[in-house]
From Swiss-Prot:
The modification Phosphoserine is found at residues 36, 184, 202, 444. Component of the chaperonin-containing T-complex (TRiC), a hexadecamer composed of two identical back-to-back stacked rings enclosing a protein folding chamber. Each ring is made up of eight different subunits: TCP1/CCT1, CCT2, CCT3, CCT4, CCT5, CCT6A/CCT6, CCT7, CCT8. Interacts with PACRG. Interacts with DNAAF4. Interacts with DLEC1. Mg(2+) binds at residue 104. This is T-complex protein 1 subunit delta. It is an enzyme of class 3 (hydrolase). Residues 1-29 are annotated as: Disordered. InterPro entries: Chap_CCT_delta, Chaperone_TCP-1, Chaperonin_TCP-1_CS, Cpn60/GroEL/TCP-1, GroEL-like_apical_dom_sf, GROEL-like_equatorial_sf, TCP-1-like_intermed_sf, TCP-1_chaperonin.
Length: 539
């Protein structure tokens, strides 16, 4: 009878035909995969940890072609990093998601995820099941979002000073921070001009075009209500047109050619003369039709097949006093149409007066010896668009200035989406750590332990801020904890003064959406990494 019991229990019997060994399962493998994923993702977080905050370091990135980028924007650093491990790539995607959702906090979100993964390692080593950790983290996240919302204060879009402070806080950690007094108002004005503050719930940043022009300094950056193109005016005599009627064509003003490659053999000079006369008559007819509509400024889309504007056509346009700008990029067409109210024309037969846009002034502006820009201002079209011209002494400065302005615009977009502000300087994270620790005491068993670990992980932001600013992280975080325990919710690290103070009084503020988005996305990513127990390579 005992033999029967043994065979029924499902234990493999050690007979010659036994299949017990074929069902071998490596119990350690899921744990090894998990720790491998966590350590790879933590390595990415540690790589950009030093670039957090106003005193954070910048990274110099060199690509395969030898092009160099200098930045401390988390999303840009990670995007250009060569990350091979799939779990580490999840953190790169996380940073990208934060960039799309909020536009700021791209470094913080990766650091928070790295810290949460560190907590997971300790919990897993204590034998807690990944599912329990994952569910507890979700509970902690829900409570954390409540805490952040309680801490926030509402903001009105009419409160210009608050918007400026938010944009300035975003710019303070950038290379161009000393120009924040110029770039912050520019960003606020740009957003306010493209939305209706009373009804807007979001901002389409495609309505704000950033044009980069080498030369000058960042002080020369300007906001233009209208259109700015880096292309030069093709005709030398006409550089200014008032009461402009602007046409945009997508066909070429040159002699027609067949699609096939062919050659024409002309046997005598009379035929040659006839060919030239035909070409001249054809182009003159095109130019006359353009002039007939009342058009006095012509924009021509770039053509890759043949010359968009022949010398003969330019000669006729010059005689008829029509200003010409050629080689307009295809991706700029939509913005141009929205700005000046024109419509793109693909064939001369459709070129009529109602296709033209109008503006007070179209002119070519000289930039103190560093090239020229073409500007159209005083547009009568209803399309709400603006252009920001970014200047700088070299390519690296211009590109970093563009990224910084983009971040500032995104911060103001966050305030339009969710009209609430929260203190910066590590204050929300310390408050989260404190309140979640209290919350963990109301829970029981493993959940309480995991929520406590989640709370401790939040302290990484103030600790890193202090470290990067040259302060002692341990004493700084301890003092912050004490101040928050006494009810000083808005106390944070004042990096500029090198100490702890009421951050709201210092006007170091950020949109609530940035913090909420960072916490949510980081927790979701960590939960995803925790749930992975195997990596399978496919052919």
């Amino acid at each position: 009878m005992p033999e029967n019991v043994a065979s029924r229990s499902g234990a493999p019997t050690a007979g010659p035909g036994s299949r017990g060994k074929s069902a071998y399962q490596d119990r350690d493998k899921p744990a090894q995969i998990r720790f491998s994923n966590i350590s790879a993702a933590k390595a990415v977080a540690d790589a950009i940890r030093t670039s957090l905050g106003p005193k954070g370091m910048d990274k110099m990135i060199q690509d395969g072609k030898g092009d160099v980028t200098i930045t401390n924007d988390g999303a840009t650093i990670l995007k250009q990093m060569q990350v091979l491990h799939p779990a580490a790539r999840m953190l790169v995607e996380l940073s990208k998601a934060q960039d799309i959702e909020a536009g700021d906090g791209t470094t913080s979100v990766v650091i928070i995820a790295g810290s949460l993964l560190d907590s997971c390692t300790k919990l897993l080593q204590k034998g807690i099941h990944p599912t329990i950790i994952s569910e507890s983290f979700q509970k902690a996240l829900e409570k954390g979002l409540e805490i952040l919302t309680d801490m926030s204060r509402p903001v009105q879009l009419s409160d210009r000073e608050t918007l400026l402070n938010s944009a300035t806080t975003s710019l303070n950690s950038k290379v161009v921070s000393q120009y924040s007094s110029l770039l912050s108002p520019m960003s606020v004005n740009a957003v306010m001009k493209v939305i209706d503050p009373a009804t807007a719930t979001s901002v389409d940043l495609r309505d704000i075009k950033i044009v980069k022009k080498l030369g000058g300094t960042i002080d020369d950056c300007e906001l233009v209500e209208g259109l700015v193109l880096t292309q030069k005016v093709a005709n030398s005599g006409i550089t200014r047109v008032e009461k402009a009627k602007i046409g945009l064509i997508q066909f070429c003003l040159s002699a027609p050619k067949t699609d096939m490659d062919n050659q024409i053999v002309v046997s005598d000079y009379a035929q040659m003369d006839r060919v030239l006369r035909e070409e001249r008559a054809y182009i003159l007819n095109l130019v006359k039709q353009i002039k007939k509509t009342g058009c006095n400024v012509l924009l021509i889309q770039k053509s890759i097949l043949r010359d968009a504007l022949s010398d003969l056509a330019l000669h006729f346009l010059n005689k008829m006093k029509i200003m010409v700008v050629k080689d307009v990029e295809r991706e700029d067409i939509e913005f141009i149409c929205k700005t000046i109210g024109t419509k793109p024309v693909a064939h001369i037969d459709q070129f009529t007066a109602d296709m033209l846009g109008s503006a007070e002034l179209a002119e070519e502006v000289s930039l103190n010896g560093s090239g020229k820009l073409f500007k159209i201002t005083g547009c009568t079209s209803p399309g709400k668009t603006v252009t920001i011209v970014v200047r700088g002494s070299n390519k690296l400065v211009i590109e970093e200035a563009e990224r910084s302005i983009h971040d500032a615009l995104c911060v103001i977009r966050c305030l339009v989406k969710k009209r609430a502000l929260i203190a910066g300087g590590g204050a929300p994270e310390i408050e989260l750590a404190l309140r979640l620790t209290e919350y963990s005491r109301t829970l029981s068993g493993m959940e309480s332990y995991c929520v406590r670990a989640f709370a401790d992980a939040m302290e990484v932001i103030p600790s890193t801020l202090a470290e990067n600013a040259g302060l002692n992280p341990i004493s700084t975080v301890t003092e912050l904890r004490n101040r928050h325990a006494q009810g000083e919710k808005t106390t944070g690290i004042n990096v500029r003064k090198g100490g702890i103070s009421n951050i709201l009084e210092e006007m170091v503020v950020q949109p609530l959406l940035v913090s909420v988005s960072a916490l949510t996305l980081a927790t979701e990513t960590v939960r995803s990494i925790l749930k992975i127990d195997d990596v399978v390579n496919t052919r």
